[in-house]
């Protein structure tokens, strides 16, 4: 039982410690508790996903990406001030860099596109019914986001 199988809210310190083969007081000692542990994990998980870049097609969010979204949402719920610090916006920054490098876009445009893609993924994972998103539509939305980036890249290079 770990974050791969369950949401962060459903795991206890004892369960996390058992999976990590450590004593549960160690988590509190070294990380200050479950929240601190997850704050340490988020950048590591985000970096692993970000190094892969944007896939050419994206049928649906991977299980790994779903876990990242749920962890991010849980962290935001537990500590609303956490993502106010610009250095903690790891996912947004990674997407911005991908858009800058892949499409040669200005940083401000790349940030907006990264935020749009994050909104799509977060909505698809957390609240697909709120916008009537069908699973097969996710790939169409992703393709549209890439097309928008390509068109913006063409317009900024003129």
Identify the function of each model-found stretch:
Residues 40, 45-79:
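Hydrophobic alpha-helical connector segments
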